[in-house]
Amino acid sequence: QNEVEKISYGRWKSFAEDLRLPCYFELGDSFSFKENLAAADALITTSVAEGFGMVFLESQLVRRPLLGRKLPEITSDFENNGIDLSMLYQSLHIPTGFLGKDRIYEDIFSAYCKAIGKLESSEQQKMKAHHALNYILSSGIIDFAMLTPSLQKKIILDVVKNKEKAKSIRQ
């Protein structure tokens, strides 16, 4: 296990368990990789960045649909060679009204300032971030991947409770 991600993983695992979401964790400890793939109805990738993207090929080898984000820097070569990745999405748009633009801005900007605070930062960098974030939010939608974990959890809670919100995101 990746030590850097262990705390975050534990939080997401607890969150899924608390909500009784249909998620399974650590199946690799109980079954072989081949058994897991054979038992799957589909494979899911949650990555927003990849090095090679093995899951994009593995799904084809076991003839299972792959659900998740299309990463053009990885997937374009695969698609150009006949691999069907049509079930992937470019972005998961969340209407900013679900959370409120001010809340989204404050949460993301605060996380950004905390992260760059560990580096040598300047007011100019913060102003650039301020303008970029305002520009992003001006469209009325934001990509789920850009949200902080606390905002992602809020969206998940909302769609679990409110099927209309879930439906509007899927559209």
Q: For each predicted feature, which ranges?
A:
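Short acidic alpha-helix that forms the nucleotide-activated donor recognition element
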Residues: 29-40, 61
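Short amphipathic alpha-helical segments and helix-helix/interface helices
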Residues: 9-13, 37, 56-57, 75
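Catalytic binding pocket for nucleotide-activated donors in carbohydrate/polymer assembly enzymes
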Residues: 52, 57-171
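Short histidine/acidic/glycine/proline-rich micro-motifs that form metal-
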Residues: 1-3
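Aromatic "clamp/platform" in nucleotide-sugar-dependent glycosyltransferases that forms part
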Residues: 48
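Nucleotide-activated donor-binding/catalytic signature segment of Leloir-type glycosyltransferases, i.e.
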Residues: 6-31, 81-98
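A short hydrophobic beta-strand element within the catalytic core of glycosyltransferases
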Residues: 43-44
